[in-house]
C-alpha cells in the first residue's frame, strides 16, 4: 500500500523536465506513444493536464519554475534574452539552506542563463546535442546511485531528446511506438524515465515531471490520409550534424553558419508551403504544418505553452487527474508544501497540494509572453513583445508597448484557437485586461546586464536554431 505521509522529515526531490513535451502527448486519451513509466507516475500520483508555461522558450520558463515568479520579475522579460537576475533567491538556494544536497544534469544552455549556479556538482551540464542514448541516460542512473547516501537531495534532470532536431533511436522506430517521430521519441524517453525511477525510493522521494514548453508536430490527418512534414531521416541527420557543429564553430564564423541555417530553414519552409498549396487546411492545420516554435509570430498558442505536470511519490495520493488550470510558478510552492518547508514570501505561485488532496481552490489566471528576440531577425518575426493572460475559458494577447489587444480566443468552444473574437467581444476584452493588469501590478524594471553575457547567450541560442 502506498505511503501517503513520510516518516522521514526531509524526503528527496526528483524534478524531471522533458524539453518540448506537449501535455496531450502523455496525459489523456488517444495517445499513440507507449509510456508505461509515465503512466506509472500518473497512476501513483496527481496529473495536471492543463499546466501553463509563461513562454515557449526554455530559459524564461525555467526561471519561473525555479523562482515561483513571472518572467517580468526574474529579469528574463526583455527585448533580448537575459540571464536570471542573480539577486533573486531561487528555490534551489532555499533547499540548500534547509540541508538539501543539490544536483543537476541539464543541457549547457541552462548554465549560460545562470540556471544551474546553485547546484553543487561540477558536472551539472552536458553538451546540448548529447542524447539519453549517447550515454547520458547511463550517466544519470550512475548519478542517482552515487547520491543515494547524500540524503536529503534535490536532483534536477533536464532531458533534451525531444528538442528539434529529433533523431529517433532504431529500437523505437517501429510504428507501434508512435504515429510521428515526435511520439516515437516520447516512447524512447519513457524508457529512460523508467530506468531513472527504478533507482529512486518512491516512499521517500517526491517525483515531479513536467516540461518547459510544448512544440508543433507537423503531422495531420486529412481525407483519411496522413500528411507528415517532420524532417526526413536525412534532414534530421543533417540538422543534427549542423547542431553539433554549431558548438565547435568559432565565434567569428557563427554569422556565416547562421546564414547557412537561415537559407536551409527558409528553403524547407517554402518547400512545406508548396506541399500545402491546394489543400483545404484549417487555420490550425496550416499553423502546425508550416510554423515553428523557434522563429516567427508570438508563439503563444496552446500547442507551445500547455505542458504536463505530474507529482508522484511521497505524500501524494494516487490516481488523481486534475483538469483545472495551473501554472509553472505553482510547481515549487507545491514542492515546498509537500515537504513542509516554510513558505517563501512574495511569489506569484501558490501551492497545489490542497487541490491534489481534493479541496477546491480558486483557479488563477496564467501570465504568458512572447519569447525575446535575437538581433538577426527575419522580416516575419513579431518585433513588438506580446503579453497575455490565459484562463481555462479564454486567452487574450496584447502588444505590450502600444497596449493594443490583438487576439482573443474562446478555449472552450475553440480549443484549437482558430477564431479570433477580439473585435466582437469588448466586454470580455475588458475583463481579461483587468486580470492582466492585476498580474502586472508587481512588474519589475529589468536590470542591465553585461553586453558580453548577452552576446554569448544569443550565440548559444542561435546554435540551437532560435532566430
Question: PLM ranges: what are they?
Answer:
Residues 1-467:
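Catalytic domains that recognize anionic headgroups
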